[in-house]
From Swiss-Prot:
Coiled coil stretches, renumbered: none
Family: Belongs to the KAE1 / TsaD family.
Residues that hold substrate according to the record: Y130, V131, S132, G133, G134, D162, G177, E181, N266
GO terms, biological process: tRNA threonylcarbamoyladenosine modification
Organism: Danio rerio (Zebrafish)
Official protein name in the record: tRNA N6-adenosine threonylcarbamoyltransferase
Oligomeric form and interacting partners: Component of the EKC/KEOPS complex composed of at least tp53rk, tprkb, osgep and lage3; the whole complex dimerizes.
């Protein structure tokens, strides 16, 4: 039996989760929410995380019914992510590991999403679409690496959606992406937007620039509604994602798709991906917002896999990095 506690705080979510041999014992989380029209700055986000992290830690232990002595390993997000929030979490994780006398493990945030998705859905060897505010990648496992077959060449799809939400002042509570999804359901007019796919790579900066420039003019002249813009943006960027995922599946000979990351809990994206999978005779796997959105349990799960395969992060090496690619990690726990 191996019990791992995971600390996640790479962006505006702070979460601490506990995993015991594939069972989620606890997974509390807090979100730093800013006013409509604003994003979240690293310093202010880190300040929020510092104010709640010890409370979340106590909640995680209480919900799991565990004490420090029961924990076998402390895992934390090493990167990628925003510098100040990552530092906040790493400092607490290092301190806890030393106070409790437990080994420490730095975890790649992207690997955390993948391993949590595999655990929850029981997907065996899927092509992974990883979509969030900071990342957009199409990934498949090969020879001890999660290989990146396609990715954004500029901004992430979640960042595109978030920045559009700021333009038309959509609420950040509970998240801009969720509110765009709800508004898109009421849209009934499709506005043609730039569509940029290059092989298995995508670009979202052009579509964002176009819609940022055109939104107020179109809305002020009654050419469309905010709901129409949300609908059109979603349909366009999700079609791009489905296209590159299908291309990667064909390249890899895969019959499974796993969607992970915060944008992955969007039901319209899952629906569109499901149509493509059905036409190919493939299967789609996805999780709900409990595990798609950044959380501590995903770091604990990746840490559990790493710890059991012999990984440990020594204290002098327990730094953080804002840039940490998925394919940099040797995946020693898979055949």
């Amino acid at each position: 039996m191996t019990i791992v506690i995971g600390f996640e705080g790479s962006a505006n979510k702070i979460g601490i989760g506990i995993i015991k041999d594939g069972e989620v014992l606890s997974n509390p989380r807090r979100t730093y929410i800013t006013p409509p029209g604003q994003g979240f700055l690293p310093g202010e986000t880190a300040k929020h995380h510092r104010s709640v992290i010890l409370t979340v830690l106590q909640e995680a232990l209480d919900e799991a019914g565990l004490k420090a002595a029961d924990i076998d390993c402390v895992a934390y997000t090493k990167g990628p992510g925003m510098g100040a929030p990552l530092v906040t979490v790493a400092i607490v994780a290092r301190t806890v590991a030393q106070l409790w006398g437990k080994p420490l493990l730095g975890v790649n945030h992207c690997i955390g999403h993948i391993e949590m998705g595999r655990l929850i859905t029981n997907a065996q060897n899927p092509t992974v679409l990883y979509v969030s505010g900071g990342n957009t990648q199409v990934i498949a496992y090969s020879e001890r690496r999660y290989r990146i077959f396609g990715e954004t060449i500029d901004i992430a799809v979640g960042n595109c959606l978030d920045r559009f939400a700021r333009v038309i002042k959509i609420s950040n509570d509970p998240s801009p992406g969720y509110n765009i999804e709800q508004m898109a359901k009421k849209g009934n007019k499709y506005i043609e937007l730039p569509y940029t796919v290059k092989g298995m790579d995508v670009s979202f900066s052009g579509i964002l620039s176009y819609i940022e420039d055109a939104a107020h003019k179109m809305l002020s002249t009654d050419q469309c509604t905010p709901e129409d813009l949300c609908f059109s943006l979603q349909e366009t960027v999700f079609a791009m994602l489905v296209e590159i995922t299908e291309r990667a599946m064909a390249h890899c000979g895969s019959q499974e798709v796993l969607i992970v990351g915060g944008v992955g809990c969007n039901l319209r994206l899952q629906e569109m991906m499901g149509v493509m999978c059905k036409e190919r005779g493939a299967r789609i796997f996805a999780t709900d917002e409990s595990f798609c959105i950044d959380n501590g349990a995903m770091i604990a799960q990746a840490g559990w896999e790493m710890f059991r395969s012999g990984h440990v992060t020594e204290l002098p090496d327990s730094w953080i990095t804002q840039r940490y690619r998925t394919d940099e990690v040797e995946v020693t726990w898979r055949d």
